[in-house]
Amino acid sequence: MEILDTVGAVICAAGSGLAPADKKLYALRDTTSTVECIPLIASSIMSKKIAEGTDSLVLDVKVGTGAFMKTQERARELARTLVGLGEQAGVRTTALLTEMSVPLGRAVGNAVEVEEAVQVLAGGGPDDVVELTVALAREMLAASGVQEDPAEALADGRAMDVWRRMIRDQG
């Protein structure tokens, strides 16, 4: 939390103990052929997000041939359900529907995707990655009451400065 407070960003992963019942519920969904049940999908996702204790949440709901939600209608239903669950739990929640019928960016694989993200932070990178990054950041800043333009932070180097401080401080 100290790095988050001083730098304003941190990379972390939730442990399996965050929402321990989720794994069992997924196995039950698999056994009962309800893996595609939107209320259960949303409950699984939001149980972990709410358990994190966040005040605001921006969700990127993918739609298209490369996504779990193949149609706009199902993606909208999932987004509405996710936002509703978040709001009921007292978490300011918004969701963007983003296309996933073609790959995002030009990289495939963790290491090269991180490299591509660093290119975006440095003011470059593929246009579609920049567009999505700015849209998600704009939503998160608005949800947090911050009146900043993330595109400006990319252009003037502030985003890269925060990245470097975060990497340095996290070791």
Task: Enumerate the language-model features and the residues they cover.
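A glycine-rich helix N-cap at a beta->alpha junction
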Residues: 1-10, 80-86, 90
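Amphipathic alpha-helical segments in well-structured domains
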Residues: 75-79, 114
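A glycine- and small/hydrophobic-rich beta-loop-beta segment
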Residues: 85, 92-171
